[in-house]
């Protein structure tokens, strides 16, 4: 026993010394950490940052569309609701993030282009994110070309073209969204290519999932910045669908494996983008909870969900409309203007300008402002009283009602008389008894459009209703036409008999509401001016607010169809247009959105060259003549699908758009052409040049071409950065096309 105990003690004493000796031997070896650094990527990133961040705060003045985006940033800083029909809110929130990081309080009057920024505006921070996005697009172009299996030299060529292209530099140095959109477009393409290339050797690995999910996230971000982002999203979805179709035909994969692949792609490329898109709007609506200048575009229910504004006015209103209720009725359509059902003592003219006669009854219009004459009383046709019973008797779907104008006590009426501006519809009026053979026709059936059951009650703000005339089945409708001077330019209201469905112009909702208690007219008039008393909460769900906001953004039309610098898609290809962004108030220094004409023209020629070569190869392959090895052919086809497809999807839809278009709309399409240009050059060198001499000559021509592109970029630099005041002669020398609008001061 004693020997065993001694043995244990010896062992315990030896173990620490053995461990110590091993640690000493470990420390004698050098600790080596290997890091692969692509110096090309580092150099391109540094150069991209230098070209985009250099003197970023200059000019310290509002440049072109900064006047609009700056307003939206101020709204975010002050939590004020706004509506911008140009795109979803993610891009605006990114710009606002720059303002928040710089400590911007939102106090600046964004009223004109060229206005000097006050000291409280962090110009550098506001322009930082677009500049970073523009800078990082340069190394991303390099990586995309590498992932397409072309050479490092070709990848460097694409990145350098992105680096020196003047229009891309200008657009990324300002508080604008195009550079951020291009960044996420390229990130979506790069992520998908990395995912696709990892498919063969490591499916379902961490990297595989990372790149697949990042593809969906990038696509969602692109769409969330501008609706134009959906074009690149469709490009990625199309290529992914083709690859998935090939995957289904792969007999080496089991059914479970194929199903797993398809589910992974569906989640990453469909579910994730939809979720993120909704998340952008959720954050947007959570931030903008205060009433703002665009409230009236939205429905009453939406307005009531905002702090202040209508929420303040409608706070405490009864929820259910009852017989005897005093209400204002707002048109749900909001087109051409948000307006309320209105009447006044003036009558329709006996004879209209076109010689037609009228009923000479009291005018009924839709008035785009709050007014005491917008109030109506919901009357039970079987009772004479205009007060609410105790307890109130709610109005339900299908009930017959009369609408009494609050200030004149005349009843809403329609009859078989043509409306003043819409002769195919009936005139709507408030009935005046002239003791002639024209009886009152003032009964209306309530139709709750968004009812859940036929027993639904008419609710303030929430219910969308139609008024169907009992005698003629005409529906109360806002025609949208402006009445002449005798109607004070207010909007025409008609009775529509040819209705095919519940159009928005026929739908109304109660915005302001109170229970009438006064038996005499003077008492009722006092009530119309008095505040409400009951408090009913009307918080809209997120999906209801999102649906309405999205619909308004898609259907809201800007009436400005012409602009000094608007252009057509055909002018973009040959760079026949430019945009003067900013002019120094005292010197001739100016900033223009003007592309590098060498790059733009060459990119268009490369697109034509690729298309011709592709169809030539395709025809020859049909004849079983393969000019390219299979690997080279597949790389050539994928490059064309991405670059030509990306260019076409981001360019051709503009021919179908009826809206103002500007040169910057072409920039996302241009980036895909720039990626294609060096690819076509490498293809020409590798497969079209037959001898080494031809390759050497072609390489020399490419170097000369790159030098000319750099020379043009340097010549246009004063118009890109706006930091140099040129003489009138120098400015005229830069006007290489008659269509370019270079600003020359007259001294």
From Swiss-Prot:
On the tree of life, the source organism's domain of life is Eukaryota
Q: Which residues are glycosylated?
A: 435, 471, 539
The record ties this protein, via InterPro entries, to: GlyclTrfase_39-like, Glyco_trans_39/83, MIR_dom_sf, MIR_motif, PMT_4TMC
Record Pfam families: MIR (PF02815), PMT (PF02366), PMT_4TMC (PF16192)
**SUPFAM superfamilies cross-referenced by the UniProt entry:** MIR domain
Q: What class of enzyme is it?
A: transferase
Tell me the function of this protein.
Transfers mannosyl residues to the hydroxyl group of serine or threonine residues. Coexpression of both POMT1 and POMT2 is necessary for enzyme activity, expression of either POMT1 or POMT2 alone is insufficient. Essentially dedicated to O-mannosylation of alpha-DAG1 and few other proteins but not of cadherins and protocaherins.
Q: State the protein's name.
A: Protein O-mannosyl-transferase 1
Which cellular component appears as one GO term in the record? endoplasmic reticulum membrane
Name of the gene encoding the protein in the UniProt record: Pomt1
